[in-house]
Amino acid sequence: MTGCNKTQLYLTTIAVILLTASQAAEAHFKNLCAQTAYPRLCWPIVKGPNPRRATHSTIRALETKTKLAIAQAARYKNGNQQVAICYATLKDAAFNLGKARRSIRKRNVLSLKMFLAAAVSDYGVCVNGFIDSRQVHTIQNAADKLRKMGSNCLLLATLIR
């Protein structure tokens, strides 16, 4: 009877350790996005606890959404000076995101942060231009969301070791 209790205790201990480890991993994943300024924009993109992969996934999502915003701005840039400015800054942001993606592959965290900061700045120029000119446009909304996602990405990049 004593041998059976030891086996049960051993199996129970293993089960508790595995459960605790899985909860810790899940908590770390949730904490990765919880640390960002805009966690609701982070959770759909980040799929794990690795900051490097999270940053890479966010850069790819930013590139995709930036291309869509560029296409949208291209339709309206001839009729609105502020949209034309946004079009140019979105193109700059796309360039900086490409450089950031290459930097993460080369494991150059300093360059990665620099290019991400430049992209966030580009998005901010677009948003602030609309605010300064007292205009409201769908491009502004897209650029604001991109700015927030870029801010999250920049924070994720600081977690890379």
Ranges and model annotations:
Residues 2-111, 115-161:
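Trafficking entry modules
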